[in-house]
């Protein structure tokens, strides 16, 4: 079970990689980010701290840092999700795809698999899809205009605003 969103840009792959590898990069394009502080940077083993507009706080632990992006764990001991940031393309056209693989047990405290799946399809998946679509919109906005997004620029979100 996952959600993902993708943006394609007429920009070099290296430009996308440069942005997502910058310390505190979420401050530029994440519409629900209050602040994104660095604990340890860059490369495998990097850790940053994300505070959402609603005050929720998570550490993000990076691993599998490659020439095509990175993977991260968000949520610390609770392990809320694995998130893949994948950059593809060449020197003229490229894309960023972000996939969220949630640890469903942290969202639903019910062991019944049928109820978990129903809850996933009816509530969690639409909420996470809306969230990641907003993040991709912010990324696209920043890459095209080189101006930071403002809080809730593309609308609010029940979980993070």
Residue ranges and their predicted role:
Residues 10-13, 64-67, 86-96, 141-145:
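A short, structured loop/turn motif at beta-sheet edges
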Residues 15-20, 26, 48, 62, ...:
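Hydrophobic pocket/interface hotspot
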Residues 41-49, 64-73:
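Short, hydrophobic/aromatic-rich segments at coil-to-beta transitions
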Residues 38, 136-161:
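Short, highly charged C-terminal tails/helix-capping segments
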Residues 2-4, 55-59, 79-84:
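Short, surface-exposed coil-to-beta transition loops
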Residues 76-134, 150-152:
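Beta-strand/loop substructures that line and gate deep hydrophobic ligand-binding cavities in soluble
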Residues 52-54, 74-76:
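Short acidic, glycine-rich loop/turn motifs
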Residues 1-41, 160-161:
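Hydrophobic ligand-binding cavity/cleft-lining segments
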């Amino acid at each position: 079970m996952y959600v993902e969103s993708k943006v394609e840009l007429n920009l070099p792959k290296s430009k996308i990689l440069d942005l997502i590898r910058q310390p505190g990069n979420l401050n530029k394009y994440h519409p629900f980010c209050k602040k994104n502080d660095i604990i340890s940077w860059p490369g495998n083993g990097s850790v940053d701290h994300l505070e959402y507009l609603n005050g929720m706080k998570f550490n993000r632990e990076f691993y599998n840092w490659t020439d095509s992006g990175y993977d991260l764990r968000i949520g610390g001991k609770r392990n809320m999700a694995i998130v893949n940031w994948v950059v593809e393309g060449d020197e003229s056209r490229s894309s960023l795809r972000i996939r969220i693989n949630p640890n469903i047990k942290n969202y639903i405290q019910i062991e019944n698999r049928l109820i978990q799946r129903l809850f996933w399809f009816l509530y969690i998946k639409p909420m996470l899809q809306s969230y990641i679509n907003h993040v991709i919109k912010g990324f696209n906005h920043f890459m095209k205009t080189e101006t930071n997004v403002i809080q809730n620029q593309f609308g609010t979100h029940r979980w993070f605003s």
